[in-house]
């Protein structure tokens, strides 16, 4: 599922409608077909959900201990007048997220630590959310899927690319209570924890409520929130619960665990 969603969401973040995927499998010797078959079926189901077709594939077998690697590439089409890009943030834009932060990262971590929780991965194809916003003719400026490095890293990359400042509201950040508790215990920051089914979306503040209404009416967008704004300046800052303001830096080094 992740191999399909990752590529579909990358295309959607560019304002493109995903159409076709190719898949390459590197299989280690000893891999059981009982393991491989459910994975392939999951890919097929996810591709169907996203409305894309897997049109080509290849396999290679290497020495190993029964593991596998999957690589996908995708093709999509994008309207000629689409201006969605990382460097297109404007002063006065509202910053939205399509749902809660850190879910996938937390699930991978708790699984590896053999901790029992009720958390579930948010891995999902998000292209239908983007298509709905564009179908409504909303002037979306920037979209980015929030993956490795979390919201902090994504926001810093976008602010730097656009030459603007982003201010986030701590009060508005959607984070599950379980993830807040886990973060407190392990010394993690939900802002640097990755997702595989969430997006940051920027558009004029006057259109934010319309965009939220559209997102919340669709699967994978029911918990969408407006979390910040764009202004002149540089960097990313957080307005804290106590009225303070602090600088948010991107994740340094390699985030652990690796989420993809």
Across the structure, where does each feature detected by a protein language model lie?
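Small-aliphatic-rich amphipathic alpha-helix that forms the alpha element of a beta-alpha
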Residues: 1-21, 41-49, 128-135, 153-156
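General beta-strand structural signal in soluble alpha/beta enzymes
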Residues: 23, 53-57, 96-99, 142-146, ...
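Glycine-rich anion-binding loops of enzyme active sites
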Residues: 17-108
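Short amphipathic alpha-helices in soluble, non-transmembrane regions
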Residues: 210-220
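Helix N-cap motif at beta-to-alpha junctions
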Residues: 203-209
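Acidic, Ser/Thr/Pro-rich beta/coil linker or hinge segments at domain junctions
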Residues: 218-260
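Active-site-proximal betaalpha loop/short-helix elements
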Residues: 28-30, 119-195
């Amino acid at each position: 599922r992740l191999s399909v969603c990752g590529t579909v969401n990358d295309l959607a973040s560019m304002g493109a409608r995903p159409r076709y995927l190719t898949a390459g499998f590197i299989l280690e010797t000893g891999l059981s077909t009982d393991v491989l078959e459910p994975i392939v079926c999951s890919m097929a189901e996810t591709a169907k959900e996203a409305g894309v077709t897997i049109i080509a594939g290849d396999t290679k077998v290497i020495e190993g201990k029964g593991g596998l690697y999957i690589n996908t590439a995708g093709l999509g089409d994008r309207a000629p007048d689409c201006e969605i890009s990382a460097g297109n943030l404007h002063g006065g834009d509202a910053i939205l997220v399509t749902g809660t932060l850190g879910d996938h990262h937390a699930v991978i971590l708790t699984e590896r630590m053999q901790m029992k929780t009720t958390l579930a991965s948010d891995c999902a194809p998000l292209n239908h959310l983007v298509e709905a916003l564009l179908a409504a003719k909303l002037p979306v400026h920037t979209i980015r899927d929030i993956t490795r490095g979390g919201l902090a890293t994504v926001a810093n990359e976008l602010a730097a690319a656009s030459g603007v400042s982003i201010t986030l509201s701590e009060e508005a950040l959607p984070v599950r209570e379980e993830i807040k508790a886990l973060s407190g215990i392990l010394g993690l920051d939900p802002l640097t924890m990755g997702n595989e089914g969430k997006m940051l979306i920027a558009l004029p503040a006057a259109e934010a409520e319309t965009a939220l209404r559209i997102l919340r009416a669709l699967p994978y967008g029911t918990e969408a929130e407006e979390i910040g704004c764009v202004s002149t300046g540089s960097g990313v800052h957080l307005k804290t619960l106590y009225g303070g303001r602090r600088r948010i830096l991107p994740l340094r080094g390699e985030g652990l665990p690796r989420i993809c």
